[in-house]
Amino acid sequence: KGPYTDTWESLSAHTLPKWYHDAKFGIFIHWGVYSVPAFGNEWYSRRMYLKGDACYEHHIQTYGPQKEFGYKDFIPLFKAEKFDAAEWADLFQKAGAKFVMPVAEHHDGFQMYDSDLSEWSKMGPKKDVVGLLGQELAKRDIVLTVSSHRIEHYWFMSGGREFDSDMPEEIPYGDLYWPSVRPPFERPAGENGALPPGIPLGQEAVSGFDVDPEFMEDWLARTCEIVDK
């Protein structure tokens, strides 16, 4: 049992550790399945299902209709065959980084570490990317910090429900696209997008939702797994 309760006020009382203030410079890494299409940005998995978006049109022209080639079909193509954790760590050390933060799971639901909670982490590169990088960083006295964007997965690819795509009407638990709930308002596509009035920054991921307890249990389990591993 920790020092926090399930309120924004309690969570806002959290203070950053001293080492973080002292570190001055760190590197935040976005790398995952979305690097296969390498178009737009790391929101490709959402934008390819939004009619009228540049990624939607690019996807059809490059890979075919979303019904025939969906986001999940990129996973076998994400091999990461040139990934070398030691080489990365050497580069970060030369750059002067004191901490490195890879995204363990982005909004797309693909885990970049060896997870026991999802079959998808056993596909693609079939490597514990975060774990291997963490081992090399430790040898160089660089702090490994990890980011999880799982919470946004609740609604992230819901655009696929609005037309005939590879997303089934009933999405089973554990499926890459689960649960893809339609959001109550359109989320901004990237850090420069504007939020609706009254939605505090940092709370936009779940604002306006009556979030499914099953999803929150799944989110908590994945979060704890990242910490434990």
Task: Label the model's feature ranges.
Residues 1-229:
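Mature catalytic domains of secreted/periplasmic carbohydrate-active enzymes
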